From Swiss-Prot:
This is Disease resistance-like protein DSC2. TIR-NB-LRR receptor-like protein involved in plant defense. Acts as a trigger of hypersensitive response (HR). Functions as a guard of CAMTA3, a negative regulator of immunity, during pathogen infection. Keywords: ATP-binding, Hydrolase, Hypersensitive response, Leucine-rich repeat, NAD, Nucleotide-binding, Plant defense, Repeat. LRR repeats lie at residues 662-685, 686-709, 711-732, 756-780, 783-804, 805-828, 830-848, 849-873, 940-970. The gene is DSC2. It comes from Arabidopsis thaliana (Mouse-ear cress). GO terms for molecular function: ADP binding; ATP binding; ATP hydrolysis activity; NAD+ nucleosidase activity, cyclic ADP-ribose generating. Interacts with DSC1.
Amino acid sequence: MAIAEVIGFFTLVCVIWYWVYKKHKNLQLKICRSSIESSSSSSSLSSPPSLSSPISRTWTHQVFPSFRGEDVRKGFLSHIQKEFKSKGIVPFIDDEMKRGESIGPGLFQAIRESKIAIVLLSKNYASSSWCLNELVEIMNCREEIGQTVMTVFYQVDPSDVRKQTGDFGKAFKKTCVGKTQEVKQRWSRALMDVANILGQDSRKWDKEADMIVKVAKDVSDVLSYTPSRDFDDYVGIRPHITRINSLLCLESSDVRMIGILGPPGIGKTTIARVLYDQISEKFQFSAFIENIRLSYWKGWHDEGNLDFPVEIMTGDRQRKLNLQRRLLSELFNQKDIQVRHLGAVQERLRDHKVLVILDGVDQLEQLTALAKETQWFGYGSRIIITTQDQRLLRAHEINHVYKVDLPATDEALQIFCLYAFGQKFPYDGFKKLAREFTALAGELPLGLRVLGSYLRGMSLEEWKNALPRLRTSLDGEIEKTLRFAYNVLSDKDKSLFLHIACLFNGCQVNHVKQWLANSSLDVNHGFEVLSNKSLISTDMGLVRMHSLLQQLGVDIVRKQSIGEPEKRQFLVDVNEISDVITDNTGTGTILGIMLHVSKIEDVLVIEETVFDRMTNLQFLILDECLRDKLNLPLGLNCLPRKIRLLRWDYCPLSIWPSKFSAKFLVELIMRANKFEKLWEGIQPLKNLKRMELGDARNLKEIPDLSNATNLESLLLSFCTSLLEIPSSIRGTTNLKELDLGGCASLVKLSSCICNATSLEELNLSACSNLVELPCALPGDSNMRSLSKLLLNGSSRLKTFPEISTNIQELNLSGTAIEEVPSSIRLWSRLDKLDMSRCKNLKMFPPVPDGISVLNLSETEIEDIPPWVENLSQLRHFVMIRCKKLDNISLSRISKMEGVHCLQITRGDEDVSGDSIVNIRWYSNFPNQWTLQSDMLQICLPELVYTSPVSLHFISNEFKTIPDCIKNLSQLHQLSFYRCHKLVSLPQLSDCLSSLDAENCVSLETIDGSFHNPDIRLNFLNCNNLNQEARELIQKSVCKHALLPSGEVPAYFIHRAIGDSVTIHLKERHLPLYLIFKASLVLFNDDEINYDYDDDDDDDYDEEVIVYGDYDSYPHSDDYTKQETMRLSCRVEGKQNGLTIQYGSSVHLLPTPHRYTEHVYIFEASFSLGECNSPEAESELVFDFKVHDYFWAIKECGLRLLELPHAHGDD
């Protein structure tokens, strides 16, 4: 009895273990699809692009060859097998298998268990259905499991394979006789895909033997690249490794040093470890020297944590000897190596091929001690240095540097989830919080790891409670890592770091330098130091500091005086600032205040003396300002005399403080203020660079600017009460930008503006009362730098004088200009010219040949100027609503093939009585033209008829589309918007991949049929379609179709009422790969979905990680924003009492009109993973769901295209 119980218990444990193992393995296949990036330089192999780190696979076979025996078996194949054998490569041999029409499970398994598939494409390859079915499975494996596919085109043209033409095509067509359309399309698609993989073409080799050697070498190289399973769970690691491998150039015998650069915590060490594990076996000796900075300062035998090198523990020479001893000991695995002089590394390693990774280098002396010169190492050696200091790499003349960037948002979420949940996706209910914590870590891998590990095992409520605290303080481990980088800075560089962290993160670099100029900081040098040490970046001219580094800086300042914020240098917390202001406890310690006004809960009452004691305040930034959040009942006594930056939008003051000095003022930004004027008298403004007072509706005058000799920007847009610009502006000799747009009270521009010899941009747009410009405006000696002049909307301006020939952009849209100066042809730098809505303009003189943008819309021009077709640089040409255009001049348009964007119409589509057509076509570059339909025949260039084209019709008038459309041989997309009178569609191009006839309510007939298997058809709300048209759409071989109908088409064998259908399979294993077509009848039922919950969408979104066909359906077009609904499909397999989810997809559909039933037909595919036990009855369950308040599924139908021997499919 006891023995029976033991046996029973053991059996139960085995069953449970097997169930958990299969469940886990299929869950991995569903969620964790991996990124397979080919690192080989050979063009003859290919693996598909994919997601993050792969699941480890054990390959049973090294190579699976697919070939047509009669072509290659006794000649080419035997030679290549001999070459494989010489290199130790063992291919799968199928000599024992009998070939027929179908492939048995054994061969399917052999294909799936082979690391490489090599397809030998010969003249008669396509004459064998066996070969074609092999190829389909190989291409599926390439897509699903990352199998590497290599091609050899043996005495056959790759183009014939791709297009199924020539002798190859004839053989293919014979094989297709009697086969279903689905099978033929599957074969054709596989041939096209495999032909797109660059491979070896035997016709291009003089000696076949040389090609065979090359193929065998490529196979050997792929087999040699075997990543360690230790790193399979690292998200996004492969792209890093691939790019670094390209820098390493391992096939070269040169000695090369490589730098891996990035800020602390970004994953440099992790990447280096993965790399070391993958390539170390290629070297005689290898060593990974971790955390060199600690070894250097504390000695090899004492590598405890060190926050800061407070004192020199050992002499410089001894520290270097210690480093060399550590390197040699780890390379040769000998702990007792003695190093007595600094030439030991060179002596011991110059004849050896070594791999050395020096991790965490932060001093040049460390490099000179361990790898001073490449001559120290033997041929083929590689030295890899990880550091956050770019200056160090430059100083050591290391030119091959890989900069590690932050992971993408989705990858960052996966990294966080690995540590928080032990898997790459969140638990149910945790998704929103997981995203918040990922954002809190700033997507920095160190932060993601620490926060995820901290939260692991906590309940949802504990997560919610932890979030507020972690938002305001750093975790200890994160702070310790980042703090080291801060501590080694000089005092001045530390100060700059804190300025940026608290005030200037995200600001323009040149602005920050101007704000801090003439201070105690060495700003230029400091920026270089912080940038070199990866503590900031200055890409795109903006200073960027990672959010965790920024939080470090804020924490450092907070600890300057815990509990007494008024004693700190910078104030950034809204509550602490509110307390200091409310209690009026400001001190001279405060240098800067950054207040996000929108975060103030109640109205903040400010006393008039609030700044009296802040004598050293230099930066006052009131951001995200809202009206009525700040109350200054008595105004302000003063502004700090050392103020450099004053940014205060919606300032409630109406009177400027009486005590004010602008001696240090660099930037004044006070948009939408209530002042009528600012300070009285003349202020010392030599440091002032920018003044922005836009939208100050009460402002009547600006202060005296005679001392503002360094002023660069004066922005006064929409100061609607401003009457004039003072004569003191003549002193602003460095003024580059003057914006007076929308100053409606401005009648005349002072001639003093002509002294602004540095002025580059002048905006006088929407100055509705501006009558004239100063007569002294022209001339190379006056305003010679002017490159941009905007006068659009200044409707009373009739003339303007000759202007500088340096002008690059001129906008006169909406002015009363009657003619353009004839000298315009001499403006050699003119690039953009807008004369639209110039109602008085009837003629136009020639413009310079270099112009790229020309807009003549809504003018009285009758003829397209003849010189237009000669503008070789013209890229944008617009003449919409030009009612007097004649057709004769339109013929010139057909010669303007170089114009990317062209728009020509006589009137609005609503009133023209003709349709507007948007044409997108591609030749050497993308083009987008908009014409009226009657212009197509006249205006279309010949190139359009042979180029890929998309057409979008906009109209309410026309009943049929123009005849010339039939001649567009490569028409890919066709859509209609507001085409309510369209009655019929003609036979269209076989290339058509998307037809959108949404809301064509009069459409009745469709001539011809659709031949592209990937086409997407949208006939939403086309309720007038006749029965013949409906049947044509439903029976078309298409990817997606949507049309009015209340029933599932008859050819869908498996049917069910509701939103789920089950297919019972015969007694055999589930298929490896499933392709099916589904049909769903959608209907409106208010009662069903009124309790629809948005959270349900979020849950389903989890299932789209594997298969996300979000773009699966063509929405109308660019002219309408159609509401969409989400429809999801989930496939489950049931066998032996187990339920395994294989995948899900999400489709976005335009929403039909209420109470109109529609049928949605779509094709989808899923990989079902590895085979299950073949003995038990199996079934597949297809669940569909509409994520919408008003819509549900009335009936569903299914048809299997890859037949897994389902009941009813025979």
